[in-house]
Each structure stands twice: as C-alpha cells, then as structure tokens.
A protein has these predicted regions:
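Asp-based phosphoryl-transfer active-site loop
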Residues: 117-139, 252
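A short acidic (Asp/Glu
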Residues: 135-138, 171-176, 198-201, 256-262
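Asp-based, Mg2+/Mn2+-dependent phosphohydrolase catalytic module
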Residues: 238-248, 253-303
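Well-ordered, non-membrane alpha-helical segments in soluble/globular domains
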Residues: 140-149, 222-234, 276-289
Length: 303
C-alpha cells in the first residue's frame, strides 16, 4: 500500500476532478483560476507549507483499479471526474499508465462540454470474436440470450461499447450477420499491434454510431497490446460522456485486461454455446452491488 496525500477543495467550481502531481511544490506552476475547477489534488509526500485546503491521507496501491475504489470509498462518491496532471512536470505514478490523463490547463475547455447523461452511467466494453460471436467462417451469435442481456444493460444506464481487433469490414459484416447492429454506442476496430495508428473514422448514420480505429501510442512494450482503457475513455469524452461510475471489460483473453474496474473473463465460443446467462449475471451483479454501495444521492455535476 502507498500513502497518498489528498487536498480537498470544498469551494471548487466543478466537482469530482482530480489533479495528480509528484509533489506539493508543483502546485506553484498552476494558476489559481485553474485550481478553482479542481476538487481534489493528490500526491505522495507531505504538504510543504500551510494551505487553506482540507487534507486527508489515502492508503491505496499505485494502480488505478485499487486507487479508484478506495478513493470513492473514502470520499463517498458514486463517480470520479477526469484525471489531470501538469504537462510541464507530469506525475510519474504507475496508476496513470494506460489511463486517460489531461493537462490541467485543459480543464476550462473540458468542463464547458455538456454531458449526454444526467446520471453518470456504467460503461461496459465487449470484445466481439469468440465473445459475442463464434469463430466459424460463417459467424453466428454465441447465444440468443445476448440480445435481451444488452437491452437490460441499457435499462441499467450503461454505455455499451464494442472493441474488436478485426478490421472494420469484418466488424461491420459480422454485426450485420448476427443482427447486433444498433446495440452499441461506440464501436472500435483494429489497433492490435504496436504501430497501427490510423486515425480514420466513419459514421454509420443509420445506427448513429462511429466505427473508429485506435490512434494511440500505449505504454506497453508488446507486439500484442491489451485493450487500454485510455482509448475507451478518449472516445467516451468524444461521445460527451463526461463522468462515469465504472468501466467493465468482457473478453475471452485475460491479457486484454488492464486497469478496468471490473473484468469478466468468459470462455471462448468456437461454436454457439448456451451460457450467456452466467456471464451476464456477473456483469449485472457488479453493477447492482456497486449502485448499492455508492448511491447516486452523492451525485453533483456542477455547483
């Protein structure tokens, strides 16, 4: 466990955003007008001088999943805002790897965006091949129960994303064959190997969804990179999802999980299998248990 110093700005104009710095002295590089939009400031070490901000200590591992859970538990929050650091002196903690981190000077622009959700949603990211569809040449749906399960997730205030390492043509053709078009808010394709950084995107006007490839350099030294939340978080912001409660990955490959709040590692499906109820229960149980533990009564968007 690491001990983090948390400075709490109860007068912040915008709630839930977190600025992470290496040390207290780095705050001298941030203008006061910018700090007014930051509710929490986090760093390791002690406060070097007197401050008007309230102070707490948080014990959490230096990894994002544990940090997010313990931070929300300590401050009784149902969700967190964006993570910021200093472009001129970025924080170097492990928890920031593969998470979307903004320069603190971008905050005034970011907080001006209107969110499409009044209550922050849960985000569920699905793999496609051998997760939702079979590995057959003529693909089939894994289990017909998937359709109703996705509808239920929508009713639970979830943003549903699809991330396939297949090319766009494969994704579009497969979704059409198994009639999964229209279920996903964001669809990502390609980007499995380091060096694939096309920035192309194409809008499907019929289903109001964007097919996008993944234009990110990731902090992973591997020929087969995992499904970094940084990519999903970037497109959520583009989709005007400013805040979210949790992010879940549903995938047959355990190596694709990195920093997700929840991971459902299901079995592969070379051919159809009647088992979706098992995996769907795991997804829903996590969401419902979370909403009980972190109720929305604590939700504040702007004050």
């Amino acid at each position: 466990m690491d001990r983090w110093t948390v400075l709490f700005n109860s007068w912040a104009l915008v709630k839930r955003h977190i600025l992470i710095v290496n040390k207290f002295e780095d705050l001298r590089l941030v203008e006061s007008s910018v700090l007014n939009n930051i509710e929490y400031i986090v760093f390791k070490g002690d406060v070097a001088c007197r401050t008007r901000l309230k102070q707490k200590w948080l014990c959490a591992r230096d990894e994002m999943k544990d940090f997010r859970f313990r931070f929300k538990s300590e401050f009784k929050l149902s969700h967190l805002g964006h993570i910021f650091t200093l472009y001129t002196r970025p924080a170097t903690y492990n928890l920031l790897k593969e998470w979307l981190v903004y320069d603190v000077n971008e905050i005034n622009k970011i907080v001006s965006f209107d969110s499409v959700f009044f209550i922050p949603p849960h985000v569920v990211v699905f793999d496609m091949d051998s997760t939702l569809i079979t590995e057959e040449k003529e693909v089939r749906i894994r289990d017909p129960a998937i359709y109703g399960a996705l509808d239920e997730l929508k009713s639970l205030n979830c943003v549903i994303c699809l991330w396939s390492y297949g090319d766009r043509e494969h994704v579009v053709d497969s979704l059409d064959k198994v009639k999964l078009n229209g279920y996903f808010d964001i669809i990502l394709s390609e980007g499995k190997r380091a060096g694939e950084y096309s920035v192309g995107e194409e809008e499907d006007l019929r289903y109001d969804v964007l097919y996008k490839s993944t234009p990110f350099y990731l902090d992973i030294e591997s020929s087969n990179i995992p499904k970094s939340p940084r990519v999903i978080l970037w497109y959520l912001q583009k989709y005007n999802v400013m805040f979210f409660k949790t992010i879940t990955l549903v995938d047959d490959l355990s190596e694709n999980n990195i920093n997700y709040d929840n991971f459902v590692n299901l079995k592969t499906c070379p051919v159809p299998v009647d088992d979706w109820n098992v995996w769907h229960k795991k997804i829903v149980r996590f969401i419902t248990d979370y909403d009980i533990a972190f109720p929305d009564k604590n939700y504040v968007y702007k004050v």
